[in-house]
């Protein structure tokens, strides 16, 4: 069968009201006003906003839209939307289609129904959405989607986009200050660029529908190890199965229509696991488009009789799914500030930005760990093919050797055996692509960017990039303050580089992060080892971290404490949901199935012993004993779990309550799951009520 021909350039961005559409359709002065708003942050007056709204509405209707929505990203980590039609009464028993300036720029939503950490009570319901003109509107399913921020009636942020935009602004300002010190007067803006590599699982819908835990929790709460997993490394980069390939083709087409630069797709390491990666874009747009990608992964999978699992650890014993956040800095003249240059001056600039990153990661390592901490990722980090929970930076041997020479004040011998004294006037040529890929590192320099590998597959990339942007802005600001006062810039820069790399070399680690020896070594270096969400959260409201975000006006102390409460409450609620789900599966299906099999064994044993012939009964006796003992042990653990849930304190009780949920609920849920795994390997397949890992992972 011939595949239909796709004109990709014509298809790309077809459903996006982007710069090209604006330039073609808006009056020149209105277009220039929008450009100033987008690049300089100048406000749009009502008249200009009204003209943009009218043109946007006409374009949307031409492309089949009948409704619009303010599309925002509340603290759930997902997106939210409320659809309104364009209709308005025309005064003659008919309607006309309109989108006013107010409807474009401002909306209202019930803020009390979203996570707010106490910022909004039920009786204080009003929240507002406001248009984000830096992210393009688009059409999906007959609705015009207008990207917006979300705040409370009193102006407190209730979303993930607002802090991201603020952090981008702060980073822009501090980067430009540094560039001016190097004599660069052309650059006006610097923007963080992000390319999120999205991992996911695809399984058959029929298998999914038979697993209550997958439907309610997004992951399996039990499952014995299958006879074959990922041991043969035969799935990674393997031939893509026809059903999956058809899904990927449709996914590409839908993403391209929405202006998403979907570039690379391949099979991942675990069976049924895959990855999609886009070309980089600015951090704000990348965040919006990753949310779209996750939504379309699920939606399009259902059209193919599949289910897309975005949970970080849907199956035990094989790789979980992450999201590698490739982060770099780009000027409005097209220069990548994390790319080594071809001249000593360019490399001095590169090393200064590198020093700021190293210093920031070391000083705020706990905050970086916090921004990727939530229940799903707790099951992944430190597991199969996932980074450890300890923050460190991989630099590669050659770049590390250059940094060592700076620290020691010695000559650096490059790969051509040429000796160079590290200085501003005699910087070494720093070759690209000399670093190997260290999959065990949570943060790796990969030639012209940093790859933050700790993100979970289901999370918004907003918070991790807020942290990266803000710590970088802080360190660059400190550097600029010092260098702007220097009488001799070159010697001051030399001193600053040596001082910074000396003070923070502990955060650089090029070894195997999976090795148990690294845990001991990290402790010796004084690096934090925060193993899970409950361990991480106190650092979220540490004075040092609150001071960082309030100083740069990214978040207020109240907003940070609210997010802290949201994370803790979410941890408790997710833990309780998983426990309730497991209890339901055990009491209604698993224990009855084990009992049915035990009864069958007992009957067989009885008949063998009473048939008048001496027959061996060792198999029935031992198996019956094992099934009975495991069932009794599972029953006891589930009784304890039920009692704990009955006595559980309210989920919004803070850190002590979260610790209680971890010790009393999560631990018992895990214990019960391990007992179920043992039962699964004993009980007759005909009696077992749920699909096994082998059934699920090899179903497509």
Describe the predicted segments one by one:
Residues 4-101, 106-121:
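Histidine/acidic residue-rich metal-binding segments in metalloenzymes
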Residues 48, 72, 100-101, 278, ...:
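Active-site proximal loops enriched in glycine and acidic residues that flank catalytic Cys/His/Asp
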Residues 48-52, 72-74, 102-103, 150, ...:
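Active-site-proximal loop/turn and secondary-structure-junction residues that shape catalytic pockets
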Residues 65, 69-73, 289-303, 329, ...:
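Hydrophobic/aromatic-rich, well-ordered segments within soluble, folded domains that form packed cores
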Residues 77-94, 112, 211, 218-220, ...:
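Short linear, low-complexity motifs centered on an aromatic residue
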Residues 125-310, 319-322, 329-565:
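Glycine-rich, acidic/polar active-site loops that bind/position phosphate-bearing ligands
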Residues 214-215, 290, 312-313, 339-343, ...:
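Composition- and surface-driven signal marking solvent-exposed, interaction-prone regions
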Residues 500-700:
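C-terminal amphipathic alpha-helical interaction region
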């Amino acid at each position: 069968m011939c595949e239909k021909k796709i004109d990709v350039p014509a298809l790309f961005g077809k459903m996006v009201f982007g710069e090209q559409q604006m330039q073609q359709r808006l009056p020149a002065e209105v277009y220039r006003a929008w450009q100033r708003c987008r690049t300089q942050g100048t406000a749009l007056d009502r008249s200009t906003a009204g003209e943009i709204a009218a043109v946007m509405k006409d374009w949307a209707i031409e492309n089949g839209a009948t409704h619009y929505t303010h599309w925002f990203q509340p603290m759930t980590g997902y997106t939210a939307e409320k659809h309104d039609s364009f209709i308005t009464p025309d005064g003659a028993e008919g309607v006309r289609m309109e989108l006013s300036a107010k409807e474009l720029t401002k909306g209202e939503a019930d803020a009390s129904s979203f996570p707010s950490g106490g910022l909004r009570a039920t009786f204080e319901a009003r929240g507002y959405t406001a248009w984000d003109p830096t992210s393009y509107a688009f059409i999906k399913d007959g609705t015009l989607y207008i990207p917006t921020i979300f705040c409370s009636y009193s102006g407190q942020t209730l979303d993930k986009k607002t802090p991201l935009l603020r952090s981008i602004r702060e980073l822009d300002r501090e980067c430009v200050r540094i560039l001016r010190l190097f004599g660069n007067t052309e650059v006006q803006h610097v923007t963080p660029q992000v390319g999120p590599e999205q991992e996911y699982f695809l399984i058959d819908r029929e298998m999914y529908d038979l697993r209550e835990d997958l439907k309610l929790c997004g992951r399996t709460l039990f499952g014995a190890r299958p006879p074959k997993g990922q041991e043969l490394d035969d799935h990674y980069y393997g031939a893509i199965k026809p059903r999956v390939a058809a899904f990927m083709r449709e996914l590409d087409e839908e993403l391209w229509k929405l202006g998403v630069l979907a570039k690379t797709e391949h099979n991942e390491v675990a069976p049924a696991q895959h990855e999609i990666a886009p070309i980089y874009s600015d951090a704000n747009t990348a965040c919006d488009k990753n949310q779209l990608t996750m939504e379309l992964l699920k939606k399009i999978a259902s059209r193919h009789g599949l289910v897309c699992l975005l949970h970080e650890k849907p199956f035990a014993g094989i790789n979980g799914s992450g999201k590698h956040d490739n982060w770099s800095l780009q000027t409005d003249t097209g220069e990548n500030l994390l790319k080594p240059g071809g001249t000593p001056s360019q490399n001095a600039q590169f090393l200064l930005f590198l020093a700021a990153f190293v210093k920031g990661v070391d000083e705020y390592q706990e905050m970086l760990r916090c921004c990727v901490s939530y229940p799903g990722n707790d099951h992944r980090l430190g597991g199969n093919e996932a980074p450890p929970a300890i923050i460190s930076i991989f630099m590669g041997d050659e770049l590390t050797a250059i940094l060592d020479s700076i620290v020691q004040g010695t000559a650096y011998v490059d790969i051509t055996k040429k000796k160079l004294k590290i200085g501003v006037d005699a910087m070494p040529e720093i070759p690209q692509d000399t670093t190997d890929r260290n999959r065990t590192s949570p943060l790796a320099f990969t030639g012209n960017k940093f790859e933050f590998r700790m993100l979970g597959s289901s999370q918004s990339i907003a918070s991790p990039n807020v942290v990266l942007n803000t710590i970088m802005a802080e360190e660059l600001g400190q550097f600029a303050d010092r260098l702007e006062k220097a009488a001799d810039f070159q010697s001051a820069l030399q001193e600053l580089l040596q001082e910074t790399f000396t003070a923070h070399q502990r955060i650089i680690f090029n070894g195997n992060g999976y090795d148990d020896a690294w845990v001991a070594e990290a402790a010796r270096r004084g690096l934090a080892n925060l193993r899970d969400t409950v361990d991480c959260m106190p650092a979220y409201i540490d004075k040092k971290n609150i001071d960082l975000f309030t100083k740069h006006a990214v978040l207020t102390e109240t907003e940070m404490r609210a997010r802290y409460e949201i994370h803790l409450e979410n941890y408790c609620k997710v833990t309780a949901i998983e426990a309730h789900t497991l209890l339901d599966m055990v009491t209604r299906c698993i224990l009855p199935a084990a009992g049915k099999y035990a009864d069958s064994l007992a009957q067989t044993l009885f008949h063998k012993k009473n048939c008048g012939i001496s027959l061996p009964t060792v198999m029935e006796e031992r198996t019956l004993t094992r099934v009975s003992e495991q069932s009794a042990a599972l029953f006891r653990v589930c009784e304890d779990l039920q009692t704990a849930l009955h006595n559980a304190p309210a989920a919004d009780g803070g850190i002590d309550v979260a610790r209680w949920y971890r010790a009393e609920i999560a631990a018992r849920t895990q214990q019960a799951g391990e007992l179920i795994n043992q039962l699964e390997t004993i009980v007759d397949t005909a009696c077992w009520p749920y699909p096994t890992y082998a059934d699920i992972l090899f179903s497509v």
